[in-house]
């Protein structure tokens, strides 16, 4: 974490004026040409864009490329890369930027903006008592951001984080227990979701809100859906907590269709660093996308049990896969788009390994399937959370008897249907019709083709394509699908799939509180608090 070192020159300057008249000091502190009150509507929009950039306001691809793609997508075997350091999740190697990116950018950009909104709409702030819906929407954004930090690292600074301007005692915030953070975040979601109301004054909220355009009903649904996610994350370690908050989420009202999906719209400009989709930009061939392919694990799953026919194929096969194609900065050139011929790259292999497997010198671009380029346009929207996840979590809750949820089969089938039919946000041609979903469900009957919880876990895994942050967390908690770890000689985990990120070296060296509260041992195979699988 970057600390407020810039405060120290200001403090030293203050010592030079200790003998001055207090009124003179007051006048000196006012710059008539400065903006002393920030526009909270602008800050809120910036915070929402920051959610899509995972905290990085200066380079929207930075965190996605290093962590969402480089670690998460490869560790859960959605993607594969025969190279080295740009994809540490493939061979379980170390990349310091991968570790640092979510931590540093979430605190320094994302949470900083949210903290300003909460401070200025609280007692003593310049907008105290106003912008109630924006304030509570910011509490939901804050819960989303901290949930991810806890899920990635374990214990993190929470209760006193982002308070450096309140005094020097907050310059090095202490670490808080993951379970305590989760409990407080669930409380925050409960209070914030309940407090939002369409009857409250708009006060610029609708214009500032680029996710739901001020639709309070959708904000409430997202708040309760996020509550459901977090409650189920805690279900293996705190059954009472999970039961309480699953009940609250259902009673409050979760997402009920793909129209409720939390999506940040993106655009080609004015800034490629802020307005464009960071995932798409990270995959551009010049930025590292060229040697990245769909994993054999994912392609084999999408092709069903019988690879000789398309009868039991997942209807998302040729939605997620754009085929075997040569992709350069100049053009996307399809080579083979036949579903039967789609082929994923095995994880944990380098070029020599691939040559040995194929029995010939491998031209990767002409051998392995790529992500559909229609999902990687610079102005494609950025999915934050979707309705499919909600239905699949309700299916799991019903299957396990948590929170009064019922009818697991109906929730499961609704979740699969929603997952198959949500890709039209990228291109209208990617929507799967009902007949294809019906055929897939008939070929894979709930609780019959495989054990029910395994089917739920596998569907959560595949439904989070592109949202690999959450797919990694779902896999760590549920344990499905059963993934075979890689064991490349360069790996650092002894052939174990990483289960957390290490803290940034800047935090280890720069925050004295790290030594007495962080999750230890600080390595890739330590489990976060809810991970029992």
Question: Where are the predicted features?
Answer:
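Membrane-proximal, proline-rich intrinsically disordered regions
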Residues: 20-72, 108, 116, 122-125, ...
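Structured, solvent-exposed acidic/aromatic patches
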Residues: 34-41, 80-141, 145-423, 427, ...
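Bacterial Sec-dependent N-terminal signal peptides
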Residues: 1-29
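Amphipathic alpha-helical surface "interface" segments used
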Residues: 71-72, 137, 204-218, 338-348, ...
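C-terminal functional modules
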Residues: 420-533
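Glycan-recognition patch characteristic of GH18 chitinases/ENGases
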Residues: 54-57, 62, 73-79, 83-86, ...
């Amino acid at each position: 974490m970057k600390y407020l070192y810039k405060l120290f020159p200001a403090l030293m300057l203050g010592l030079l004026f200790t003998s001055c008249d207090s009124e003179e000091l007051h006048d000196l502190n006012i710059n008539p040409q400065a903006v002393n009150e920030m526009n909270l509507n602008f800050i809120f929009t910036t915070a929402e864009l920051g959610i899509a950039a995972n905290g990085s306001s200066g380079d929207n691809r930075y965190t996605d490329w290093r962590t969402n793609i480089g670690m998460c997508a490869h560790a859960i075997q959605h993607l594969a890369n025969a190279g080295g350091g740009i994809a540490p999740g493939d061979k379980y190697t170390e990349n310091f930027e991968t570790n640092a990116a979510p931590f540093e950018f979430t605190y320094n950009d994302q949470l900083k903006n949210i903290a300003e909104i909460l401070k200025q709409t609280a007692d003593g702030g310049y907008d105290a008592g106003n912008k109630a819906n924006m304030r509570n929407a910011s509490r939901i954004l804050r819960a989303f951001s901290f949930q991810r930090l806890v899920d990635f690292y374990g214990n993190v600074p929470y209760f006193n984080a982002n308070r450096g301007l309140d005094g020097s005692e907050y310059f090095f915030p202490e670490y808080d227990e993951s379970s305590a953070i989760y409990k407080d975040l669930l409380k925050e979601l409960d209070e914030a979701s309940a407090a939002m109301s369409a009857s409250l004054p708009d006060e610029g909220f609708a214009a500032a809100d680029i996710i739901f355009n001020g639709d309070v009903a959708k904000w409430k649904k997202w708040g309760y859906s996020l509550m459901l996610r977090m409650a189920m994350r805690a279900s293996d370690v705190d059954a009472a907590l999970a039961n309480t908050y699953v009940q609250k989420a259902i009673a409050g009202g979760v997402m009920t269709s793909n129209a409720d999906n939390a999506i940040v719209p993106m655009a080609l400009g004015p800034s490629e660093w802020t307005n464009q989709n960071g995932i798409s930009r990270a995959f551009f061939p010049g930025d590292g996308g060229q040697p990245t392919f769909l994993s054999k694990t994912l392609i084999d799953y999408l092709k069903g049990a019988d690879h000789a026919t398309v009868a039991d194929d997942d209807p998302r096969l040729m939605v997620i896969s754009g085929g075997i194609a040569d992709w350069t900065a100049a053009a996307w050139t399809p080579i083979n788009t036949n579903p039967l011929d789609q082929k994923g790259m095995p994880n944990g292999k380098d070029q020599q390994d691939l040559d040995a497997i194929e029995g010939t010198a491998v031209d990767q671009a002409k051998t392995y399937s790529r992500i559909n380029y229609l999902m990687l346009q610079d102005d494609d929207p950025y999915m934050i959370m979707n309705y499919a996840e909600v239905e699949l979590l309700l299916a799991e809750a019903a299957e396990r008897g948590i929170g009064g949820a019922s009818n697991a089969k109906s929730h499961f089938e609704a979740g699969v249907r929603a997952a198959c039919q949500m890709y039209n946000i990228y291109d209208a041609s990617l929507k799967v019709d009902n007949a294809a979903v019906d055929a897939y469900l008939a070929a894979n009957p709930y609780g019959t083709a495989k054990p029910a919880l395994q089917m739920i876990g596998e569907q959560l895994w595949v439904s989070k394509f592109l949202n690999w942050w959450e797919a990694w967390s779902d896999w760590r908690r549920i344990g499905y699908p059963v993934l075979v770890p890689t064991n490349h000689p360069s790996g650092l985990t002894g052939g174990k799939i990483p289960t957390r990120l290490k803290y940034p070296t800047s935090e280890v060296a720069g925050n004295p509180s790290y030594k007495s509260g962080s999750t230890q041992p600080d390595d890739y195979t330590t489990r976060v608090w809810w991970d029992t699988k």
